[in-house]
């Protein structure tokens, strides 16, 4: 509380040191910011079936309409403010055709890094779709945003665009691919 003694005419200075400024700033911003109406609307819109359309366009790098660009910008902004979830997450994928499964899993070999250009929906609840041919598990999650407040039924955790994950393990049992991922910052 008290300042340490100083010598007259001394050029010493006093300041606050922050080890990781970016992390501190992100944490401060998240704690002291509420979602705007547009940001909250974007989260709710994502939870609806709009997530499928926007993610498909982002995944395939298809041009977005002006409305979709605003939607993505508002959702990006919202995810910077929403608290992160820490723990285990899962994601279930069901494909119509076996060749689609094979096409999807070709990049999921141990040690490889995969990048998702789209928003990535996961759950901290039980397996979302036990009939999915691909079950993805994210261990030690720290970067996913907990949107369960808006989608409690699915216990959804949403990753921002362009997140990278390292493949830790990939096994196939009873026709189901089990893939374990680790977040890369």
Predicted ranges, named:
Residues 11, 26-185:
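Mono-ADP-ribosyltransferase
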Residues 1-23, 27:
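Acidic, glycine-rich two-metal-ion catalytic cores of nucleic acid-processing enzymes
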């Amino acid at each position: 509380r008290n300042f340490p003694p100083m010598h007259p005419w001394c050029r010493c200075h006093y300041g606050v040191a922050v080890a990781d400024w970016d992390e501190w700033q992100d944490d401060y911003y998240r704690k002291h910011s509420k979602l705007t109406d547009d940001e909250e609307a974007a989260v709710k819109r994502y939870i609806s079936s709009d997530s499928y359309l926007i993610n498909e366009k982002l995944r395939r790098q298809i041009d977005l309409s002006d409305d979709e660009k605003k939607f993505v910008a508002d959702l990006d902004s919202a995810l910077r403010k929403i608290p992160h979830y820490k723990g285990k997450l899962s994601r279930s994928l069901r494909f119509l055709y076996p060749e689609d499964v094979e096409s999807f899993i070709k990049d999921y070999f141990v040690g490889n890094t995969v990048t998702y250009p789209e928003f990535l929906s996961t759950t901290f609840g039980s397996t979302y779709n036990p009939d999915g041919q691909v079950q993805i598990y994210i261990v030690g999650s720290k970067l996913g945003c907990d949107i369960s407040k808006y989608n409690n039924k699915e216990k959804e955790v949403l990753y921002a665009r362009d997140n990278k994950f390292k493949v830790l393990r990939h096994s196939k049992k009873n026709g189901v691919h089990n893939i374990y991922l680790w977040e890369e910052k």
